[in-house]
């Protein structure tokens, strides 16, 4: 977890973090978003209770959601609206050519007022957002695992060492920053697995110590 936080800290200080508000540029006809009531020019404030601070957050939060319905909080003419959207699940490929089942709601996102707000953070703010990202990934992973146990999550998204190595090699071709980001996410996942109450893992040792 500490290693992941350090990686995010480095990225936010050196490269920066995006804070561009997300506005809906298009709502596709007959899409889940249109049926739920989303409209063009709605500003997305929250998804599943998590604040949307950047256009980049929208796709991430939709992808990480595991419940049947996704909760949207949007601003329309300075009024806050709360909508529940049941996403469609489509078989597709990610940017690296890996087959995935993707959750989509049928919206096209753009920058509010077409202004991009990408800033390099000072050490204190970078630390805050680094810890926040570690917390988000940890809680989302635990939520996903819980949904998988009860049969509500897509198990095709899981991958073993071979798949991780393959994806890591593909990501490395895009540069050091995307590679570091992926390593941070993997570090969090390994940290969680290490805490599971399984013999030979730290979680197993802690369980035995608790029994003693």
List each language-model region with its residue ranges.
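Functional transmembrane alpha-helices
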Residues: 91-192, 210-212
């Amino acid at each position: 977890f500490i290693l992941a936080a350090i990686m995010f800290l480095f990225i936010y200080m050196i490269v920066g973090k995006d804070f561009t508000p997300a506005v809906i540029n298009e709502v596709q006809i007959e899409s889940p978003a249109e049926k739920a009531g989303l409209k063009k020019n709605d500003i997305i404030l929250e998804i599943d209770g998590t604040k949307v601070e950047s256009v980049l957050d929208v796709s991430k939060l939709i992808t990480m959601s595991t419940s049947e319905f996704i909760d949207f909080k949007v601003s329309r003419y300075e009024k806050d609206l709360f909508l529940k959207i049941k996403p469609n699940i489509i078989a597709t490929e990610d940017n690296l050519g890996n087959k995935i089942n993707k959750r989509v709601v049928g919206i096209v996102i753009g920058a509010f007022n077409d202004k991009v707000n990408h800033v390099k953070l000072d050490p204190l703010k970078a630390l805050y957002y680094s810890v926040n990202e570690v917390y988000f990934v940890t809680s989302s992973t635990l939520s996903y695992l819980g949904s998988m146990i009860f049969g509500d999550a897509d198990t095709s998204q899981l991958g073993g060492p071979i798949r991780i190595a393959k994806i890591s090699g593909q990501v490395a071709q895009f540069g050091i920053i995307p590679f570091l980001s992926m390593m941070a996410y993997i570090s969090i996942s390994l940290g969680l697995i290490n805490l599971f109450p399984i013999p030979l893992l730290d979680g197993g040792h802690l369980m035995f110590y608790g029994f003693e």
